């Protein structure tokens, strides 16, 4: 079974400054994300052993650990692609039209997404996702690394609201961090994810 690996970034750690510091990106990627990768591989190894021993209590424990660490790995893998030193501004084309249709305007979407991020209690993410059943865009608060986002949602844009993502630079002023985040959003990546979600998921989850 192939192991999960830490992805390389498309930009240097300092490339998102002054909006997100190089120190934060280095620790976030090389320490925190790496820990999730190790955690998911460890959980898979222990899960395989538990299944071989028919130890159902250990199976359930490691399935829970797998969900958490794999969620962390997936979320961060999207996060790095969602960011770019050439980001910011607004989306265009089909994604822009879909945002206008779902939220009324980009400014209304930005306000709703920012409110979801700033309003999170504890740790988690704000997510813009594509609902493959309703064929629409929705925003969610994702709790921890894996809770509160329903199955069938394809994540397009995420902002990490765990303290390790911002505290060294923004302290407890989450709103300033979220405001800075918009300056480095890689809309080309979000558009690519939207195009794939709308064209490649028909019938994948719902017949």
Swiss-Prot record:
<dbReference type="GO" id="GO:0004784">
    <property type="term" value="F:superoxide dismutase activity"/>
</dbReference>
<feature type="binding site">
    <location>
        <position position="160"/>
    </location>
    <ligand>
        <name>Mn(2+)</name>
    </ligand>
</feature>
<keyword id="KW-0479">Metal-binding</keyword>
<dbReference type="InterPro" id="IPR019832">
    <property type="entry name" value="Mn/Fe_SOD_C"/>
</dbReference>
<feature type="binding site">
    <location>
        <position position="76"/>
    </location>
    <ligand>
        <name>Mn(2+)</name>
    </ligand>
</feature>
<dbReference type="InterPro" id="IPR019833">
    <property type="entry name" value="Mn/Fe_SOD_BS"/>
</dbReference>
<comment type="similarity">
    <text>Belongs to the iron/manganese superoxide dismutase family.</text>
</comment>
<dbReference type="InterPro" id="IPR036314">
    <property type="entry name" value="SOD_C_sf"/>
</dbReference>
<dbReference type="InterPro" id="IPR019831">
    <property type="entry name" value="Mn/Fe_SOD_N"/>
</dbReference>
<dbReference type="InterPro" id="IPR036324">
    <property type="entry name" value="Mn/Fe_SOD_N_sf"/>
</dbReference>
<comment type="function">
    <text>Destroys superoxide anion radicals which are normally produced within the cells and which are toxic to biological systems.</text>
</comment>
<dbReference type="Pfam" id="PF02777">
    <property type="entry name" value="Sod_Fe_C"/>
</dbReference>
<dbReference type="InterPro" id="IPR001189">
    <property type="entry name" value="Mn/Fe_SOD"/>
</dbReference>
<feature type="binding site">
    <location>
        <position position="164"/>
    </location>
    <ligand>
        <name>Mn(2+)</name>
    </ligand>
</feature>
<protein>
    <recommendedName>
        <fullName>Superoxide dismutase [Mn]</fullName>
        <ecNumber>1.15.1.1</ecNumber>
    </recommendedName>
</protein>
<dbReference type="InterPro" id="IPR050265">
    <property type="entry name" value="Fe/Mn_Superoxide_Dismutase"/>
</dbReference>
<dbReference type="GO" id="GO:0046872">
    <property type="term" value="F:metal ion binding"/>
</dbReference>
<feature type="binding site">
    <location>
        <position position="28"/>
    </location>
    <ligand>
        <name>Mn(2+)</name>
    </ligand>
</feature>
<dbReference type="Pfam" id="PF00081">
    <property type="entry name" value="Sod_Fe_N"/>
</dbReference>
<keyword id="KW-0464">Manganese</keyword>
<keyword id="KW-0560">Oxidoreductase</keyword>
């Amino acid at each position: 079974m192939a192991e999960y690996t830490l992805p390389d970034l498309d930009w240097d750690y300092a490339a998102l400054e002054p909006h997100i510091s190089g120190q934060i990106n280095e620790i976030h990627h090389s320490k925190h994300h790496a820990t999730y990768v190790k955690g998911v591989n460890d959980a898979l190894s222990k899960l395989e052993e538990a299944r071989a021993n028919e130890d159902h209590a250990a199976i359930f424990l490691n399935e829970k650990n797998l969900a958490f660490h794999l969620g962390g790995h997936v979320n961060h893998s999207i996060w790095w692609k969602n960011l770019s030193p050439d980001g910011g501004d607004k989306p265009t084309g089909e994604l822009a039209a879909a945002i206008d249709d779902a939220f009324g305007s980009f400014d209304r979407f930005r306000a709703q997404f920012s409110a979801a991020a700033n309003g999170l209690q504890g740790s988690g993410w704000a997510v813009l996702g594509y609902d493959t059943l309703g064929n629409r865009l929705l925003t969610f608060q994702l709790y921890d690394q894996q809770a509160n986002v329903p199955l069938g949602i394809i994540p397009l844009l995420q902002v990490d609201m765990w303290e390790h993502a911002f505290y060294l630079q923004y302290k407890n002023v989450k709103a300033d961090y979220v405001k800075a985040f918009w300056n480095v959003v890689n809309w080309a990546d979000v558009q690519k994810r939207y195009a794939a979600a709308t064209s490649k998921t028909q019938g994948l989850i719902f017949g």
